[in-house]
């Protein structure tokens, strides 16, 4: 903090000495009608009784940290360069709010792809996805995983009604507060601009 204000500094966690392992696994993500390629990074995390868990992280290879000026001021509309620079960017203007929609969709789309791939590898036929995965949605930020999973299942040839049923059996939702300001609501034109494939 300086002068009563929070100051953020970049954290170069994806440098050559990072514990995050770059993989060859990539997924297509469409934002505002433009195709992007997300890359999976795996980070080993110490777990219970000496076991190891894996934290899956996604990034764009096109991220450009040189666009950061004075703390976290950057061009919020340059998605290819800044999508994952700062999660939960300043949303006091429309560009910041739309960037949040892009970020949320980017994360849930990649997670949904990975969940489906891992279920298929373990023997799922996707009609039985709930036997292979449980998706716990905490608060509203990752809730776009629901329509995204439905969309991806339909792309794989599953009818909409069954895709909805599969996702209903796979997803659980917990909301930790009932305060109105904690419940995200996005104007429909944000979704039409950022993720029209979900509408």
Model-identified regions with their sequence ranges:
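A conserved ligand/cofactor-binding region detector
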Residues: 1-199
């Amino acid at each position: 903090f300086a002068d009563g204000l929070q100051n953020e500094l970049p954290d170069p966690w994806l440098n050559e000495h990072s514990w995050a392992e770059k993989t060859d696994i990539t997924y297509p993500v469409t934002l505002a009608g433009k195709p992007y390629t997300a890359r999976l990074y795996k980070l080993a995390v110490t777990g219970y009784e000496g076991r190891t868990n894996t934290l899956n992280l996604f990034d764009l290879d096109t991220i450009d940290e040189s666009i950061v000026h004075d703390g976290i001021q950057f061009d919020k509309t340059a998605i290819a360069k800044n999508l994952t620079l700062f999660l939960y960017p300043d949303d006091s203007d429309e560009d910041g709010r739309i960037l949040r929609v892009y970020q949320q969709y980017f994360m849930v789309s990649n997670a949904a792809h990975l969940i489906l791939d891992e279920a298929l590898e373990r023997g799922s036929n996707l009609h039985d996805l709930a036997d292979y995965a449980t998706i716990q949605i905490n608060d509203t930020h990752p809730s776009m995983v629901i329509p995204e999973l439905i969309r991806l299942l339909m792309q794989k040839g599953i009818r909409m009604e069954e895709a909805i049923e599969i996702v209903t059996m796979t997803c659980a939702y917990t909301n930790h507060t009932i305060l109105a300001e904690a419940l995200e609501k996005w104007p429909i034109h944000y979704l039409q601009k950022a993720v029209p494939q979900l509408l």
